[in-house]
């Protein structure tokens, strides 16, 4: 008996937080797009997402990373309203605005100053602190061998499990199909993937493929 062929406009390999968020954003921008997510473990016992710390910070040295972090922090702070589903319990990500603190030795102060200047120029609340200011703000810290610190009080962390399930439930409500299977091989042309072969014998055909598979 021939195995079924599953057809999508976009097929996403991996249903962790990246795969589910990609699926949601595709559907939010193009609701008519047929999206399928292939995930072998619906319990997420070994998923990369659940091994994450959930930290979100703007303290990066490249503008692209800073912009992505600014978007992410704003998105997570408003996650409940963005992921709301009529008649369903709101998504909980337990956002904690605990701030981030980076410290450097004296020879790295100039680099930290450049990074903070870039972050400030992009509208981020990041404060450069001298060793004396570090001691005042964090009395338990030994600052004798420090050159400076950078504190971003509006950074924080969230619950990765809540983030994952918020995206997954929202994507499912938008019509994303979740396929409980493992990708075992791909049929490839010289410059593109044509189809995915699953462990149950099914074949996934799509116009576009996204690799969101994690390390586990």
Specify the residue positions occupied by each region the protein language model found.
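Active-site loop/turn elements of alpha/beta-hydrolase fold enzymes
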Residues: 40, 131, 183
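Glycine-rich, N-terminal phosphate-binding loop of Rossmann-like dinucleotide-binding domains
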Residues: 15, 60, 105, 213-214
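Gly/Ala-rich phosphate-binding loop of Rossmann-like dinucleotide-binding domains
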Residues: 23, 27, 170
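Conserved Rossmann-like nucleotide-cofactor binding loop
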Residues: 18, 43, 216
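Dinucleotide-binding Rossmann-like beta1-alpha1 core, especially the glycine-rich loop
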Residues: 53-137
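Glycine-rich FAD pyrophosphate-binding loop
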Residues: 27-49
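Helical element adjacent to the flavin cofactor pocket in flavoenzyme catalytic cores
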Residues: 150-208, 212-216
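Beta1/beta-strand and adjacent pyrophosphate-binding region of the FAD-binding site
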Residues: 3-18, 36
